[in-house]
Amino acid sequence: MSASDEEIHELVRQEAGDCLQRMEANLLTLESGDGGVGEIEAILRDAHSVKGSSAMIGWGEAANLASSIEDRMEAAREQGGLPPDSVGPLLHAVDALGQALDGEPKRETVAKSPPPDAPTIRVPAAKVDRMLDVVGETVLYHRRLEHALGTVSGGGASEELDMGEQLLDELQDSVIQMRTLPLSTITAAFPRAVRDLASQEGKEVELAIDGAETQLDRVILDGISEAIVHLLRNAVAHGIEEAGEREAAGKPAAGRVELRAGRRGRMVAIQVADDGRGVSPELLERADEEGSLVEILAETGFSTAERVTDVAGRGVGLDAVKRHVEGLGGGLELRSEAGRGTEVTLLLPITLALMKVLLFERGGHPFGLPMASVGRVVAVAGTTSLGNRPSLELDGEVVPLSDLGRLIEAAGEPLPRNPPAIVIESLGRRAAVACDELLGEEEVVIKSLGAILAGMPGYLGAAILGDGRIALVLDPSFLLSKAATAATTMDRPAETEEHAAGRVLVVDDQFAARELQRSILEAAGYRVDVARDGREALRRVGEIVELDLVLTDVQMPEMDGFELLEAIRADEEHGSLPVVIVTSLGDEASRKRGAEAGADAYVVKEEFDQQTLLETIERLAGR
Amino acid sequence: MSGVQVRVRVGREHYALPVTRVLEVAELGDLTPVPGSPPEIVGVHNLRGRVIPVLALATLLDLSDEEPERIVVVELDERCAGLAVDAVVDVGELPEASERVDSPYLTAAALADGLLVGMLDVDAILSSVSPEAPA
């Protein structure tokens, strides 16, 4: 067994890359004055090792460059130190060495810089992705097997099947984890970038990095480095003041920029914070009035620095960062205090492999949209038209309405009467797209459409559903811009007559279920309020005047539907409010509990039928 | 240029490609169309968890009367696709491909059992298809 030349080259390049990162870090430490002989010797060792491995495979240029760095460091060791002004030229030499090593095309690999003591294997990323495909498919087959066996046998087999499912889940989790890498794989270049930029700006800035061990999907890491560098540039160029201004404000002359990373629930938060001038009080005031500071800065490409530099303005490029992060299913937050500093937070999913999507159908085929981009779902009943284009009125705002089929130029039947429409929101832009039917909310594995279709606009990828069908996952920003420019986006949907119906509170912790019920009821003319659990619902019951009916799910966090029902019945003022229970619990005991607690009607989700539900509600809420 | 060839039928015509280029043959099954993709891409197929585009040989070769039921999976570097064919006829050696053809997707043609069999240029097919640039 022998490794190919290419494999050996790749190995040398990766090892040398680790050496270069350490050399750079040590040079920066020496420049700051904190370093000493220890750093000099470490650089010497790394230069020596790069020289050796480069020479061995005949890369003369790299070997010569490494050798010159080695010579310089040997001299420094004899002198017992390195003059600070010679750090600059040495950093350039390290750069040149990096370029010489990069002379050949690289292959993408997982695990670029392992912790020094743990044994590691390097695996091409495509192999891990293939593994994930197969594991995902095995899970589907297992479910089908479970279903098929469930109808013929019970007992012993089901335990074995449960165990199999647990093991498969574990397997899928570990494969997904193989796709993650620590943030430190991209942070190595940041101290240098900040140093170069600060000196270019004539400022003194120190960068502190915390939480570099935080794990993220490698695909996210690949794309996020540029965004972080952009935020660091913004902080140095526009956040941190000149030394004089800082001292006058009673701050230390050197500015401080912090890069922090850590888990926040199911997301990873990466923060870039500076102790600079912050945004102006006027802008903060405007943000208070108009909603969010990040939207204002991103939308207008606002710059807080009065002079124009060759570096990005505070807000310039922030829209690009925001779009990028949202495209990954994440979000952007920004806090600023005048005179005290600014903190930008990138919220990112830990893995791109798994994404929460809203699934729906158009023209007989399933599609998905990232939940992060879905504002709400409405039923299209009355439409207004603006400049001859159909639109919806939502919270007093006119939102363009399009047929999804028309937007992506898919062949398809006309839309049904009162179709559901998904309201997509991003960067203050909104558009509603109508489809045939909502399928629900699901966490899916996002797959590439393959190399041939990869460059195609409009899609983030595809997901394989439980029945083996492929759902195309749509790119929300593509739909938003299409909706804004397309000429005819929809045939006028059939309108229903309005009838004065009552006001209903829909309680469900599942977004899709809640919005589905809302859309059905709104289409029938009801005014609808929503709550996510029993506790919120109970509060809303007290607040809403003229509430006619409560439609509630049973299984919810905080306070479940039965508890909510009991609390309403125990309330003096609202004790007689009609309550309809909509649940997947169809068993006798649950029905009995519902009846005992005083439910007016009990609807089982599996038997869910729009017409019956509406009739029940009309009977109970009729005025 | 000989070797073992996979012979396929599209409409009333026969074509062949080297067996060494065929990853597998699968049922066409239900395809998911990808709106906005080039016309020769009829949809995407779920190949045991991997999503691959399916190319209509009939569209590429300007044929009619096709009733595709199978896909022949081929690959060039990272570019993997299924070629939609009506049926796989035979796997075996073919007479020397001596007839000249005038198609960018064929290298030559061979006369076998009184039929003209077009030799598919798999690389040309896979590199010719790409999504149109954004409008």
Predicted regions and their residues:
Chain B
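An acidic, low-aromatic, low-complexity terminal/linker signal
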Residues: 1-135
